[in-house]
């Protein structure tokens, strides 16, 4: 397993001069990580990353910054709502996915990652989010993005999230089987598959996901959770209730070189979380 970090968590509480792409990348390497999850709009302030900005020059810049630190970009994040009810907005979002795929291809990044949204402009869970119609809309709008991914030779990975359209194993498999694209992959975030309605069945829920989605999992996000009156709150690994034993055993046995990025860390706990995961991984 190759451990990395979500880059916009790095130096997030520091002054602006410490939040440049170069400074964040250098800090990630200093903290002992080998790869990063890169969301450009969250790491480079003051730039609107529409398709016009997603240029060949940007790809060269990204490649140079991370190459200098000997860091891989495990995934280029592009979190735009493909189930937005406005067709014009969907078309704009699709163009930004196309641009992200182009940058990924030119920068040597193997994967663009996304979540699956909600059938409203607010990108918020509502009564229709888990409907069949919402899933059909998402798949319809994902199709041209996958076609472009195939042309660029880049993987397009979706991340199931409990309160999004693709919320569980069954709906994930519906997308995989329905799209029939060799470039469609899965980002496995165990905590994001949990909610207040199923957290007490955590081991069963995650065991099913690892068993049935195994062949499709291309990357992992690792974080922890605590229970609050408003639901589950994500925290850095080692700061909540999560038991990583079965997950790390699965990764060691079935995905030995997979890239796994820590989420919800701070500069104060990132190294501690990395060392925890490394110790647990060595022991399983």
Name what the model sees in each region.
Residues 21-42, 108:
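Catalytic domains of carbohydrate-active enzymes, especially glycoside hydrolases
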Residues 22, 26, 61, 65-69, ...:
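Active-site acidic/histidine proton-transfer and metal-coordination neighborhood
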């Amino acid at each position: 397993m190759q451990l990395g970090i979500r880059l916009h968590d790095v130096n997030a509480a520091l002054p602006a001069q410490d939040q440049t792409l170069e400074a964040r990348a250098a800090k990630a390497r200093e903290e002992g990580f080998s790869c990063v999850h890169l969301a450009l709009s969250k790491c480079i302030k003051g730039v609107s990353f529409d398709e016009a900005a997603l240029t060949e020059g940007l790809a060269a810049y990204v490649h140079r910054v991370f190459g200098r630190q000997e860091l891989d970009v495990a995934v280029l994040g592009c979190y735009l709502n493909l189930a937005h009810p406005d067709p014009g907005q969907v078309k704009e979002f699709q163009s930004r996915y196309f641009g992200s795929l182009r940058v990924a291809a030119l920068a040597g990044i193997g994967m663009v990652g996304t979540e699956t949204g909600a059938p409203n402009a607010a990108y918020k869970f509502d009564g229709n989010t888990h409907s069949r119609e919402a899933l059909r809309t998402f798949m319809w709008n994902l199709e041209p993005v996958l076609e472009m991914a195939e042309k660029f030779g880049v993987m397009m990975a979706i991340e199931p999230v409990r309160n999004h359209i693709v919320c569980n194993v069954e709906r994930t498999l519906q997308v995989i089987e329905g799209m029939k694209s060799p470039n469609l992959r899965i980002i496995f975030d165990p905590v994001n598959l949990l909610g207040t309605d199923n957290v007490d069945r955590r081991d069963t829920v995650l065991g099913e996901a690892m068993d049935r989605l195994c062949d499709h999992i291309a990357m992992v996000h690792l974080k922890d959770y605590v229970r609050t009156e408003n639901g589950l709150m994500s925290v850095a690994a080692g700061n909540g209730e999560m038991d990583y034993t079965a997950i790390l055993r699965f990764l060691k046995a079935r995905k030995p070189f997979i890239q796994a990025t820590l989420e919800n860390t701070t500069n104060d706990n990132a190294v501690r979380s990395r060392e925890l995961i490394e110790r647990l991984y060595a022991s399983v």
